[in-house]
A protein has these predicted regions:
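PLP-dependent class I/II
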Residues: 1-270
Length: 270
């Protein structure tokens, strides 16, 4: 099951509807996974009010929450949000070094109740016995013997400039029919086009123009919802390349919209 989001994060009203629907079938939700900070793919952040409501629902319907926070330290504007884990012990908190040090270091951490950690440790041992000791020593050295917080501030400055470049280019080049999220941090933003647009069918044209994106339906369990959406990533390219990429992508979108408008005028699409 998946729960839609808006600019304030996961829709708690729709989550509660889903919980009630599951309960009518004599079943219950056991665990909910969420990225409350700068969610992938939408880039949105769950508000404090919705975080509080999510915890209330977890008690009311008796389920655990997995709080995945890979991007939480990469904030470019706004204030720090208190983690769900800091508010309730019904939460399993996941963190990673890969977004704030080096993507090739797949080292992370878990904060969870002791009994849950014991079971996770057994599963981990069955999967790979032990994570790379060398990688763990590198990470330990990074946090202990280097000015890592200063390095993190450089990352935040660089990524923030790239985000700003993408948002400015979207405002300048994208058609009025398009809308998008305004991420306060992280790597991604979410573009929504008119419902009759299929972004997946546009991907080949975008690649031919030298740009790419991730079609929205890739992020939905039914493979249908989100077909008129796309995820954009601003973390890698320079601001100049991002601006040019958005200009090219806007041209691809505008050409496709012109085609759809012709069908609308002919009455083939309503």
């Amino acid at each position: 099951h998946s729960v839609p989001f808006d600019d304030e994060g996961m829709r708690m009203d729709l989550l509660e509807e889903e919980l009630k629907r599951i309960g009518k079938g004599n079943k219950r939700l056991k665990m909910l996974y969420t990225i409350p900070n700068f969610q992938n793919p939408g880039g949105v952040t769950m508000t404090g009010e919705r975080r509080k409501r999510l915890i209330e629902l977890s008690h009311e319907y008796d389920f655990m929450i997995i709080e995945d926070d890979p991007y939480g330290r990469l904030r470019y504007e706004g204030g720090h949000m208190v983690p769900l884990k800091a508010q309730d012990d019904r939460v399993i908190y996941l963190g990673t070094i890969s977004k704030i040090f080096a993507p090739g270091l797949r080292i992370g951490w878990i904060c969870a109740p002791v009994d849950v950690l014991a079971r996770i440790s057994l599963v981990k041992q069955g999967a790979d016995l032990c994570g790379s000791t060398f990688d763990q020593v590198v990470v330990e050295h990074y946090f202990t013997d280097t000015p890592w917080q200063r390095t993190l501030q450089k990352f935040i400055k660089t990524y923030g400039e790239r985000r700003d470049a993408m948002l400015a280019a979207l405002e300048e080049y994208f058609p009025p029919e398009a809308s998008w999220t305004h991420p306060e941090g992280g790597f991604f933003l979410w573009v929504t086009l008119p419902k009759y647009v299929d972004t997946g069918s546009m991907l080949a044209d975008a690649l031919e123009a030298g740009v790419t994106f991730c079609p929205g339906d890739s992020f939905y369990v039914d493979g249908v919802t989100g077909r008129n959406c796309m995820r954009l990533n601003f973390s890698y390219e320079t601001p100049e390349n991002i601006t040019e990429a958005i200009r090219r992508l806007a041209k691809v979108i505008e050409e496709r919209l012109e085609l759809y408008r012709a069908f609308i005028d002919a009455g083939a699409i309503k």
